[in-house]
């Protein structure tokens, strides 16, 4: 049956610009992050929190714009989107203002309702009197009985107790109680004989009543984010279940009675403490989605191969030492998550899983793949082998990359890209070879005509092939932390280039042709040996970020004033930089500037000591362009 999610609240997040004293590495595309098979949003506990500080006015690296706004930590509701567990949020926990007419000792608790059209909780009152939470629940049950309601949503209503009168709601087909403070369920819950969907996620349940087995029609049971230390025995008696969510509990053991749930098509045991999976898993032959990620599994039972209808199997972030050969029986498999385990090898039988479109084994200890494995998986579009122990590309030749659009080999020990390895990869647009041992690039690099993103950062490259100018579709080029002494003049032919990262090389100069990169938005030259910048840099009118700190610059060209879109400028740690051009004040969009450890002796000491804002003001005041 369809799962309603129209009332799922969205939590507004705010952010504001912060001062950065050193540029961060930019332009590097992130490695593939795998996938979550139950498609749920992250809880507030798992979301990163952003901590910001207001810029100091007396620092020499600072935000030139006005500071404002506040930082809010990420938070999402557990409402459902397409493919998620059931349930929608129509109310949120809150304690709005109580009626001033009531004595404090008898003031009822206020329930706030979050309306779909607004992010602001609104107190619900009737005739000036706040509704008591428990009384409200009882009234809802009474209404359910009288009107034969089919769907009842009491999510996020600060409910702590479900009253026995729930037994009267026998007409219910969908019952949503997620996001409350319920620690136990009454036995009367077993009277809801027509119930098909029961959402109890984000509560404090430690057990379930045996009467739950009376729910003979139950299809979907959501118990995510509770406090279950084991799978309650009564769950194994719910033979009609097709979808079971047990994510983020404290479950350590999965019992053999799991075999009783033969109707399951979706099972999520993600983020528990499971060390072993019973062979009984093989009885769940209707399973299409199985999420066992973020547990402590070291091995899988051979019986996993009996789950022949699986299309998605997520095993990432476990302690797996091996994968059974029976994995090859899962001929319908489309997504297989193996990231961050302890695998040293991949079974040959995986070549039978020809419907897979992504192969991701990031964060293991694999040094080689079975011969021809990738070539057999002809539908692959994304290959991620990053953070392993590869010394060379997988054997299989050009055929293994025929339909691939993205390859990530970051953080391995590869010292060579074979000539012609991508000769059949006509759709390859992204290649990440960051943190390897490359000393040179293949002579046929000019044939990679569809390439959009190249990352060769943190290798040992001493030069770039002149043919790099043939990559007419290239938009992002990362060459940071290499040993480059020069950039070929042909760099100017990369007309679509938006990001060029040359940080931490040995460059003493830049070709004037760099000014031909009219689409360039981010240019990173930090930590080189540059003594000057070409005047043609003024032609980069789309540039928003320029980092030339930690060089040997003696001056900045006057043409820098034509960079009308420049927002961030880092010129820190240039020991010979004694003055700045007045034209710098023409960069009206400049918001962040770093001048730490630059003498700037041509400027008054009190101006330099006042930081970038005062420096810019001084340049404006004394500039011959001040009337402009």
Curated annotation (Swiss-Prot):
LRR repeats: 148-169, 171-192, 194-216, 217-238, 240-262, 263-284, 286-307, 309-330, 332-353, 355-376, 379-400, 403-424, 427-448, 450-471, 473-494, 496-517, 519-540, 542-563, 565-587, 589-610
Highest rank taxon of the organism: Eukaryota
Pfam families per the UniProt record, alphabetical: LRR_14 (PF23598), LRR_8 (PF13855)
SMART domains: LRR_BAC, LRR_SD22, LRR_TYP
Annotated keywords: Leucine-rich repeat, Repeat
Region ranges (Disordered): 23-130
SUPFAM superfamilies membership: L domain-like (SSF52058)
Biased segments, Low complexity type: 69-92
The family this protein is said to belong to: Belongs to the SHOC2 family.
Function of the protein: Acts as a Ras effector and participates in MAPK pathway activation. Probably acts as a regulatory subunit of protein phosphatase that specifically dephosphorylates Raf kinase and stimulate Raf activity at specialized signaling complexes upon Ras activation.
Protein name stated in the entry: Leucine-rich repeat protein soc-2 homolog
Annotated source species: Culex quinquefasciatus
Lineage per the UniProt record: Eukaryota, Metazoa, Ecdysozoa, Arthropoda, Hexapoda
